């Protein structure tokens, strides 16, 4: 439990110390944000900061960070180091800068921002790459929840039914103004996720289960360690739990709803 506690403290310290350093590098100011200058009642809508945080939290803490960290834990104490240092120095920095760059560029998505500086060809390549990734991730994010819901209703509603329901929800959430579905439902899901995280944390400190310590060594404890070495498999398994460039596709959604650049660190980092 000592290593686990130190890792938690390191993540908190990383936000306040290194996060503040990155914020000073970017230098947020008091200029008007796209939510105010380009308000359209659909995508560009000012939202409360707490709600933006909840939505962004849910955008980041999806299937990847949760299941990835669980699978990555099989590799032993090395996963502690990758999650902590990867999050502080790579993942959080990337997500913060991606969101702030969008905030500075009229809420544009990354392909459009890239096109400003690297030209039309690069923008089109990034658009194509993003579309492919969105299709792959979208398929997983439809099939995954549908499969879990189908297990809860094995005698009445099958996987196909839940795929249709989840897919329909995604379509409506995409087409309707951001404050109608995403702004109302996402914070509820985020509260549920935070409640579960706090519950697990309390359980760990109440029951004191045996957890590996960093001084026990960094050996690969995966059951199939020969076929699945720490490098590169652990880094791929815990990609979203430490760094994932794909998160940058979500940050512009909330950059279009922020009313101050100074809210960037608590929202994105």
Give the location of each predicted region.
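Extracellular loop-to-transmembrane helix junctions
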Residues: 2-19, 72-102, 111
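Membrane-interface "cap" regions at the ends of multi-pass membrane proteins
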Residues: 10-66, 263
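Flexible loop linkers connecting adjacent transmembrane helices
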Residues: 20-45, 69-71, 93-122, 256
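Hydrophobic, membrane-embedded alpha-helices of multi-pass small-molecule transporters
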Residues: 48-64, 203-209, 219-269
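Membrane-interface alpha-helices at helix entry/exit sites of multi-pass transporters
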Residues: 77-83, 112, 116-131, 257-269
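Membrane-water interface regions at transmembrane-helix termini and the short interhelical loops
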Residues: 101, 112, 141-153, 167-189
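Small-residue-rich segments of transmembrane alpha-helices in multi-pass membrane proteins
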Residues: 117-118, 124-125, 188-203
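Hydrophobic alpha-helical segments and their helix-loop junctions in multi-pass secondary transporters
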Residues: 138, 142, 146-164, 174, ...
């Amino acid at each position: 439990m000592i290593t686990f506690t130190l890792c938690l403290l390191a993540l908190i310290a990383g936000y306040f110390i290194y996060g503040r350093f990155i914020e000073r590098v970017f230098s947020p100011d008091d200029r008007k944000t796209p939510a105010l200058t380009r308000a359209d009642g659909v995508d560009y809508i000012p939202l409360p900061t707490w709600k933006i945080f909840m939505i962004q939290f849910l955008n980041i803490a999806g299937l990847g960070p949760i299941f990835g960290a669980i699978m990555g834990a099989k590799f032993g104490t090395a996963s502690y180091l990758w999650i902590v240092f990867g999050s502080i120095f790579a993942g959080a920095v990337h997500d913060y800068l991606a969101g702030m760059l969008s905030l500075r560029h009229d809420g544009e998505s990354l392909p459009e921002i890239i096109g400003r500086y690297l030209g039309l060809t690069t923008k089109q390549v990034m658009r194509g790459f993003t579309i492919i990734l969105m299709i792959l991730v979208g398929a997983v994010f439809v099939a995954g929840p549908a499969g879990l819901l189908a297990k809860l209703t094995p005698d009445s509603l099958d996987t196909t039914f839940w795929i249709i329901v989840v897919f329909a929800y995604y379509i409506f959430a995409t087409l309707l103004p951001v404050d109608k579905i995403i702004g109302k439902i996402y914070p509820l899901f985020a509260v549920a996720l935070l409640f579960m995280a706090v519950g697990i944390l309390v359980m760990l400190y109440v029951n004191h289960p045996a957890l590996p310590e960093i001084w026990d060594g960094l050996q690969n404890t995966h059951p199939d360690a020969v076929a699945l070495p720490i490098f590169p498999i652990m880094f791929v398994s815990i990609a979203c739990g430490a760094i994932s460039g794909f998160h940058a596709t979500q940050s512009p959604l909330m950059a279009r709803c922020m009313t101050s650049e100074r809210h960037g660190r608590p929202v994105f980092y």
